[in-house]
Amino acid sequence: MQPFDSGHDDLVHDVVYDFYGRHVATCSSDQHIKVFKLDKDTSNWELSDSWRAHDSSIVAIDWASPEYGRIIASASYDKTVKLWEEDPDQEECSGRRWNKLCTLNDSKGSLYSVKFAPAHLGLKLACLGNDGILRLYDALEPSDLRSWTLTSEMKVLSIPPANHLQSDFCLSWCPSRFSPEKLAVSALEQAIIYQRGKDGKLHVAAKLPGHKSLIRSISWAPSIGRWYQLIATGCKDGRIRIFKITEKLSPLASEESLTNSNMFDNSADVDMDAQGRSDSNTEEKAELQSNLQVELLSEHDDHNGEVWSVSWNLTGTILSSAGDDGKVRLWKATYSNEFKCMSVITAQQ
């Protein structure tokens, strides 16, 4: 393990690798985004560019899939999501290497999370913030990355939290291309799975129970070689929870559901009425007819304090968690399908 100095002047909120693991983007309360590249000869991380991106703390960033170019999305407490594209013709460390494509400013509250969808769903992203509304945007014309369309809105919280209260919101897309479009969303103490139905709209498919305090992080595991899905959460109560998600579908039904989901990938649906209320009857009906079964596989409190981040490896076999104890723990399933801590990493290693 080799640490590097980010050079930020304030708290670093997010650190994200690109698809190939050769670049790292960081964001901070100093309102700057920094991009580092890996030097193959020295294995050191070198600054590629740094720029002031928002008017308030930047709390989340994400890389788009590489087939759409080198694009970064950033979310901030200034209530905006901004998209950035690299210009390789500009000199490194000039502050001009990343150009702003557009600003998405539909949110009425501070934003906490932004994530690009898996590549097979097209160029789209989701964001979630303090107004309690999940928003999905599509680049309907990939040749024009400056034009993004708001295609879905879902009211995750009936009443948004007061500004003076501590809150947190996270989201994670289902990476499986063999499953209908789904994403897991955490808002305060609740975690919900949304799925796009045959009507082209997002509906509540399942809820992840048992959380008794703020959920700080949620991560949907890749399901390579596995017939079920895994979702992990990290919470303020110091616990890591790993859930098993089973889809009750026959192969024929799965194929039909996937086909119907793909038909509506680019549909412009808004799931709230003119007064901003979600169709609760439709959601309840969809939840009752949900094909998802949720089971709590493991629950651990090894960090002895708040858990701030959970993340899966590329194969979905190892989970990493980071907490207030200043340690990163790696978790792996045993033959009995129970997750055990296999390694503990500290900053001194």
Swiss-Prot record:
GO terms for cellular component: nuclear envelope; nuclear membrane; nuclear pore; nuclear pore outer ring; Seh1-associated complex; vacuolar membrane. PROSITE patterns: WD_REPEATS_2 (PS50082), WD_REPEATS_REGION (PS50294). GO terms for biological process: cellular response to amino acid starvation; mRNA transport; nucleocytoplasmic transport; positive regulation of TORC1 signaling; protein transport; regulation of TORC1 signaling. The keyword Oxidoreductase does not apply. It comes from the Eukaryota. SMART domains: WD40. Residues 263-285 are annotated as: Disordered. Keywords: Membrane, mRNA transport, Nuclear pore complex, Nucleus, Phosphoprotein, Protein transport, Repeat, Translocation, Transport, Vacuole, WD repeat. Residues 274-285 have a biased composition (Basic and acidic residues). WD repeats lie at residues 7-46, 53-94, 106-147, 153-192, 210-253, 302-341. The keyword Repeat applies. It is a peripheral membrane protein. It is found in: Nucleus, Nuclear pore complex; Nucleus membrane; Vacuole membrane. One of its GO terms (molecular function) is structural constituent of nuclear pore. InterPro entries: Sec13/Seh1_fam, WD40/YVTN_repeat-like_dom_sf, WD40_repeat_dom_sf, WD40_rpt. The modification Phosphoserine is found at residue 257. Transmembrane segments: none annotated. Component of the nuclear pore complex (NPC). NPC constitutes the exclusive means of nucleocytoplasmic transport. NPCs allow the passive diffusion of ions and small molecules and the active, nuclear transport receptor-mediated bidirectional transport of macromolecules such as proteins, RNAs, ribonucleoparticles (RNPs), and ribosomal subunits across the nuclear envelope. Due to its 8-fold rotational symmetry, all subunits are present with 8 copies or multiples thereof. Present with 952 molecules/cell in log phase SD medium. Belongs to the WD repeat SEC13 family. Functions as a component of the nuclear pore complex (NPC). NPC components, collectively referred to as nucleoporins (NUPs), can play the role of both NPC structural components and of docking or interaction partners for transiently associated nuclear transport factors. Involved in nuclear poly(A)+ RNA export and NPC biogenesis. It is also required for normal nuclear morphology. Component of the SEA complex which coats the vacuolar membrane and is involved in intracellular trafficking, autophagy, response to nitrogen starvation, and amino acid biogenesis. PANTHER family: NUCLEAR PORE COMPLEX PROTEIN SEC13 / SEH1 FAMILY MEMBER (PTHR11024), NUCLEOPORIN SEH1 (PTHR11024:SF3). This is Nucleoporin SEH1. It comes from Saccharomyces cerevisiae (strain ATCC 204508 / S288c). The gene is SEH1.
